[in-house]
Amino acid sequence: MDFRLTEEQRALRDGTRELLAKRFGRERLRAAVDAPGLDRALWRELGGAGFFALRLPERAGGVGLGLPEAVLVLEEAGRALLPGPLVACQLLAGAVDGVAAGERIVALCEAERDPVLWEHPGDCDELILVEGGAGRGGAGPGGGSGDGPGGALRGAQGRTGGACRSAADRIARAPFTSLDPLTPLARVTDLRRTAPLALDVPRLRREAALLTAAQQLGSAVRTVEMAVGHAREREQFGVPIGTFQAIKHLCAQMLVRAEIARSAVYAAAVTERADEVTAAKLLADEAAVRNARDCLQVHGGMGFTWDVDVHLHLKRAWLRAERWGSAREAEELLADGLLA
Amino acid sequence: MDLTYSPEEEDFRARLRTWLGEVLPGLPPKPAARDWPGRRAYDTAWQRMLFDAGYAGLHWPRDAGGQGATPTQHLIFLEETERAGAPYVGANFVGLLHAGPTLAAEGSPGQRARWLPPILRGDDVWCQGFSEPDAGSDLAALRTRAVRDGDSYVVSGAKIWTSHAEVADWCELLVRTDPDVPRHRGISWLAMPMDAPGVTVRPLRTLAGSTEFAEVFLDEVRIPVGNRVGAENDGWRVTMVTLSFERGTAFVGEVVACRRVLGALARAARANGRWDDDVLRRTLGRLNAEFAALWRLTQWNVSEAQHGGGVPGTGGSVFKLRYSHARQELYDAAAEVLGAGALDADHEWVADRLSSLSYTIAAGTSQIQKNIVAERVLGLPKGR
């Protein structure tokens, strides 16, 4: 047993970080806030670098790596606040033509959520609708113990579900003002089920949750760095605010959250166990959201402004926390698991 | 990122499991929680069984009498012994987990030959004389004085929070050997026999009702200079070696135990109807995630230690911070499950709930740990 990253994994992480720093630095990030359309050239560049084809076998033009490597890459994307349906394109690279190379952009949509939300509707070529997740009867308000505690959820987990695809221009949608300025959303008003797509949906859900958790982890780590960087430089009462124990303790707690989430996310990437993925998503969601809030607190009044990037991390963290299993659903599933 | 165990490690696990299956049914019943002489006898007898079977000092180096096992094997040992319900390290805690490793790392050949074998055989029990009444978390403020007189130090002062002092043979004692230099530089590390004239032990009763630790008063106790480990006034550095062992590996078996208790809590709640409480059920689900992650963090830390020279790194502070609070949340949840039964002081979960209150204080309070993480890991400036 050696849980640490291999040399190749560290190189992949560092290389991804460098690529994103070069192509999606702070200036590009702030420009995207004002004009949130996806940069097709960047998308193709990411495709060319193997960002989406990471897990495809080499004979299919892929890189032949595994889920742990995909997690490391998406952690970096989360750090950089890179926008776009990254998880969808990573998961559908082998299933939809052109996605692996970054030529076509697809999004995933969870049919059982209400409202049914679609990320980057103006930038997508196709939308893949996924059905058969944790039903609202099990996870919504007032649910949970209809047919015995956790029964509805257990049943939902067992459902195989299905997926279907639609060209983006054939989907009826209603406007929806996104909380996250970097992630435009639309509400899907007509769930078309005409073109089924053969996918292992339970597996897709599991991997989508894990890769989303990986982005949350990257964001949680980044906000620790932002808080610490600010605490070292910002002076009050003639000293850096980082000398104050109250600030130190906020920062230390942020690191603890991020590192606990890292252990959970990396382990789930290795074992691919459903319970570990659920736990990883729960802890990474919390780390991203809580760390962004604490980072905002450390930044004081400036943290509450649009000028500082903290709100972008918080809003994206909230958005991701709503996708592929909420805290409530995760806790119910994990409670149920204790009785198994 | 590899979480599979090698064939050698799996073989080690299988042999250990077989041995535990053979010997555990024949163990005498556990002594009462407050019977410290009984617990000493029980714990040292178990240590002797480990010694005879070749499992004593598993993670100690071979030249110190240990088995030279890898940190991963040590992890497997702690996992399997806890899973099988084997006795915990108990009264041998200080000797095996920090005094011994410190002596192995810093002692002279003569000191190692004298003190290490009796720890491994279960003959000697050690206690820790670090903390003082006026120097809690600020360990370097200690005032117990040692004045050189020929071949001896004459030691006077008082120690506190000394676990197992009532039944210990030896004490790892920090003393001030030079009061005129900056406070970290005038400290020495001594091995003190607990039966030396001038040593008085006054057991302290914890809020859990146990006398697991004591105050130790030292009145002109003569300790041979040859009992000093490391150079005179170099005790602070030796102490840091000790503390890194204490923080890094001391809680591994407990995480396994907490995961077992969490499952038992869920089943008990299902049986008594408390499971229908959404808040409680979600708390248990969340704790499931927490303890699973803490176990993975342990594996991460062990992997780091295995490749970084064996002394656990700062991951220990991150672990300790989260674990100490998660343990308290676990037993608070147990009280929710028990309802009025949580007022029964003899219930195992209630006793553990009480003792869990010490976890955010002992071995460096959460507040001190946060300072360590902020300053040494995150590089924030020192406070005033």
Q: Residue locations for each model-derived region?
A:
Chain A
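FAD-binding core of flavoproteins
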Residues: 81-87, 91-225, 229
